[in-house]
């Protein structure tokens, strides 16, 4: 049920819509100036490609088969000791 006592200020709504469309809201320019868009795009691209700062360094040092064997041995030792 609509509240008929409050009227919409059409001029204010138009102003807000215009600010939103242009990306210049109340905080738009303050925070946007601190964001390096090119750097963010580069980081997003690296993340999507799986090549983050540490992506290849750690992946190349991990032998999944060896880890599985170590986990299996640890589980067997734990069962024998309990």
UniProtKB/Swiss-Prot annotation:
It holds the Pfam family SASP_gamma. Transmembrane segments: none annotated. Keywords: Repeat, Sporulation. The record marks 30-31, 57-58 as: Cleavage. InterPro entries: Spore_gamma. One of its GO terms (biological process) is sporulation resulting in formation of a cellular spore. Sequence repeats lie at residues 19-45, 46-72. The keyword tRNA processing does not apply. Residues 1-82 are annotated as: Disordered. The keyword Repeat applies. SASP are bound to spore DNA. They are double-stranded DNA-binding proteins that cause DNA to change to an a-like conformation. They protect the DNA backbone from chemical and enzymatic cleavage and are thus involved in dormant spore's high resistance to UV light. SASP are degraded in the first minutes of spore germination and provide amino acids for both new protein synthesis and metabolism. Belongs to the gamma-type SASP family. This is Small, acid-soluble spore protein gamma-type.
């Amino acid at each position: 049920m609509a509240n008929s006592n409050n009227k919409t200020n059409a001029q204010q709504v138009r102003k807000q819509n215009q600010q939103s469309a242009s990306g210049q809201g109340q905080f738009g320019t303050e925070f946007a100036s601190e964001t390096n868009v090119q750097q963010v795009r580069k980081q997003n691209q690296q993340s999507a490609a799986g090549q983050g700062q540490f992506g290849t360094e750690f992946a190349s040092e991990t032998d999944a088969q060896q880890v599985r064997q170590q986990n299996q041995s640890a589980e067997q030792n734990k069962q024998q000791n309990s």
